[in-house]
Amino acid sequence: MRQEHRSILSVGRSIPSRAASLLPQLDSPPSASARIRKLATLAPHRRDAYLVAKCASGQGELVGNRGLLGHLPSSSMPPQKSPQSPVTCEQRVLISNEHGEKLVGLLHQTSSKKLVILCHGFRATKDDSILVDLVDAFTKEGISAFRFDFSGNGESEGEFQYGSYRKEAADLRSVVLYFSKQKYDIIALVGHSKGGNAVLLYASKYNDVPIIVNISGRFALERGIDGRLGKNFMQRINKDGYIDVKNRKGELEYRVSKASLEDRLSTDTLLSSRAISKDCRVLTIHGAKDEIVPAEDARQFAAHIPNHELRIMAEANHRYTGHEAELTSLVLGFVRRHLYHRSTPRLRPKL
């Protein structure tokens, strides 16, 4: 699969000085392989040398709390805060889904091949602040992370669809297969809002990722529609075949087709929840003051998913405004606990 790379700026990551200080010594050798050989002799830690060399060869960008460290003089390098701070390299990755549409994502590569995949919500993108905060937490833990745009969203190809729950789960399958072929150990899938539905649907169909985190996903998909489409939406869509959703200025935001609405209404969250393997660890986090999806939906997931843990955050809304650190801590703690203390064998795909 072809990969496309571009310069990425990142904030909030700590790069050890032992690795970052190697970049000024690279004197522009004639080839990427020459750079890698030179770095192998310079770096005192083999995995750090590999990551710095990979970034220097054009396969990604070494990032730190001031952005692209390779573009800064050594005197500008941030001080080393901890000898255990991970090196992180970011790559822009293109992955084809089953329809041939290119899904665009960012791989945050640490020295570990353990990987968490993060999924955005309705009308959001891979740059959603919730996902960015989670990526920062995982990479500081030394775990690689990948965030991407579902088809029809953000930079990815395809047409935006109102429903598309099954298609987004299929997009996620394409991503999992891609990284599995690259020999990554995919340890967890994390999704916010509609992305939570995507990771749960994935788990109900495939039994190959051991940890699932559903943040504010919706159980009762028949609810919440009139908030976006207005009253009497069924009569209107049956009459015209579609409904145009406009913003407060009267500008068209997106069109809801009858087929996409039917896709949402026919997605059975009860059946899919019960189909998740008891060997899969599932965490649902929900805000008690969620103004988009009621907390009762989280309790419904808890009632029907076999191996499930529920956390209700008393003061949090749908975006976890003012509670971002607590959300990140819950997600990271759950993944860390089951990653390092799991006793069950690696899950196998359902036949």
What would you call each of these model-derived segments?
Residues K102, T110-F150:
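Short, surface-exposed "cap/lid" segments of acyl-processing enzymes
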Residues E253-A275, E296:
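Active-site nucleophile elbow and catalytic-triad environment of alpha/beta-hydrolase enzymes
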Residues I276-H286, D290:
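Short beta-strand/loop motif that positions the catalytic acidic residue
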Residues E291-D297:
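Conserved alpha/beta-hydrolase "acid-adjacent" motif
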